Structures are given as C-alpha cells and as structure tokens.
Amino acid sequence: MECDKCGRDAVMQAAYSGSHLCETHFCRSVEKRVRRRIRADTLLGPKATPENPETWVIGLSGGKDSVVLTHILDETFGQDRRIEMLALTIHEGIEGYRDESVDACIELAAELEMRHELVSYEEEFGVRMDDVVEENPENMAPCAYCGVFRRDLLEGYADKYDADKLLTGHNLDDEAQTALMNIFQGDVKQIAKHFDASIGDFEERAEQDDFIPRAKPLRDIPEKEVALYAQLMELPAHITECPHASEAYRGEIQELLWKLEENHPGTRHSIMSGYEELAELAADRYGGDSDSDDDSNVGGDSDGEGDSDGENSGDSDDENSDADLSECERCGSTTSGDICRKCQLLESIQAT
C-alpha cells in the first residue's frame, strides 16, 4: 500500500476518507487538522499581544491525547509571544498507575521547556482514589467521583493562574460519544451547554463570566490516529487503562460507534457535523440557561487512561449552570446550590 502523496509505504489507511499516507504525510495531516480546528474555533483571541498575552492551561495527564495535544500546541505556538502555556497534571492517587503517567508528563514538559504544575487529590482534598473506590459511600462508578474532583482542580488552578483558556485532549471518538449520549438522553439544554462550554467558535459562544472557557483542538482526530501519531513521533505517552475505569453507558455508546464506523466509515464525522449545527441552534435557544454540566467527558484519553479531567464524568451536578450561581458555603467555588458537589462527596467520604 503506497502513500497517496509520495508513493512511499503507507502507515495508515483512513476508510472514512479513502486516503493512504506514509509516516511523514500522516503526521502532517494530523497537525494540519488540529491547526485548522484552532483557527476555526478562533482559539487565539484577536486582542492577544506580546505585551498582553493569553494564558492557556493544558490538562496534561500523560495519556496519548493530552501528550499529543501538548506537543502540537508547542510546535505551533511555542515561540509565539502572544501566548503563555502551562501544563497542569493531576495525581489522583492510583497506585501502580498514575506515577508512570506523571513521569511522562514531567519528561514531556522538560523536553518542551514548558511550565509544569503538579497537584494531587491527597494534597488538595485529603483523599486518594484507591481509598475512595474501596469505600464508595455514594455507590457510584469511580469515574463519577474522579470527574468531580478533577474538574474542580482544573478549573480552580486555571483560575489561580489567570487562564484565558483551558485546553483538554478530547478526540473525535470522545466527542461523538458525548454527542450521542446527549441526544439519546434527550437533553437539549445539555447540548446547548456543550456548545457554549467547549465546542463552539469562541466568537459565537455565550458569555460565561464564572468559568474558564474550554477548547478541544483534537476533536477532529480519531482516537486511533492520535495513538498512531504518538507512537510515530515517539512521544512519552503512558498508554495504559486506568484500573478503576468503568463507565457502563459510555462503554455501550463506544461499542455502538465502533460498529457503525466499521460498517459505515465516516459516521463519527457525520455525527459531529450535524451535532455541532444542532448544538449551535440549541445554544441560541437555551444559552446561559442550562441546568447541567458541560458534556460528560473531560480531558480525552477515552481508553481509560484517567485523563477525564471532569468533563465526561457522567456526573451531572449543575455546577456549570449559569442560572442562580452562588459561592459554595464550604470552599467558595461557584455552584448552583449552597454546597458544591465536590464538598458533598468529600463529606460523604470522610463520614465513612
């Protein structure tokens, strides 16, 4: 099988496009699509200047998605004085798993000479995910706890560092899964929230003064292509499934998408093309009035590497609703009730 561009041996065949690409042209293709998404979403604001640069916080877990995202962002903007990038890594407290991915984060950040911050559940909340899973006071899936805690730290530290954007490594598979979940659940307000929070053009999104805007530059790239890019570029990605990963409903959707894509190449792209148009219409109707979280998958790495970063946790706790927001009585974070979901969970865990 030869590369369509140069005739060299192809390393991938994209059934959805019919293209065959060698290593060089495949990597260029991934980078080109990511940069096209960055331009389409107007990720770099027009007011950013070397004198007044934007700050981008990147959720870096050490999994393939976040590592590829960080690498391409550095390749694209590393010398651009209009942007200051900071990689944020969160240690959940999962023995025999997270330490290796943290090492990958440290290695990548050092290689790129990028500022890198490491925080942990244990230091911030006094809990470790291994213990939470064992006790499970709320009888929930581990990802539900982890998503709430991770989202709180991502948003809290993004705010601490005065971030203008919070970037996560969601790929095409992640986003198509979330789209189908929202549609199957009939949650139109959630679809509107998804648009305003993380998939709409920044110039078209509703104002969200209480939350750092999110961006997902990898959301046009299939998961397998992200993994292949990481391998070919020899990036220090930790590709191992989180031992606590368990999202039954999302897993069903994932398997459904795999079958549809296999039988009908291009299904994921078609889903997202239509979904984004519907999401924009929903945002026009419900923008600023949604009662649920941003989608249910934060950070990408849908293979269970623990890079969920709170967004796709499957826990809809209303923390990102713009309606009737106030400060949590316990920690001061923004919430739609008296006590935020994170503090509710911590209280439940500490009571066991």
Describe each model-derived feature in a short phrase.
Residues E261-R268, S273-N297, D309-N312, D317-N320:
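Glycine-rich phosphate/adenylate-binding loop
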Residues Y16, T24, R28, D99, ...:
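Electropositive phosphate-/nucleotide-binding environments in soluble metabolic enzymes
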Residues E277, A283-G288, D294, D317-T352:
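C-terminal, charge/polar-rich interaction regions
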Residues D9, H91-G93, E122-E124, A197, ...:
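Short, solvent-exposed coil/turn elements at secondary-structure transition points
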Residues F149, D173-E262, S270, G300-E319:
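Catalytic subdomain that performs nucleotidyl-dependent activation
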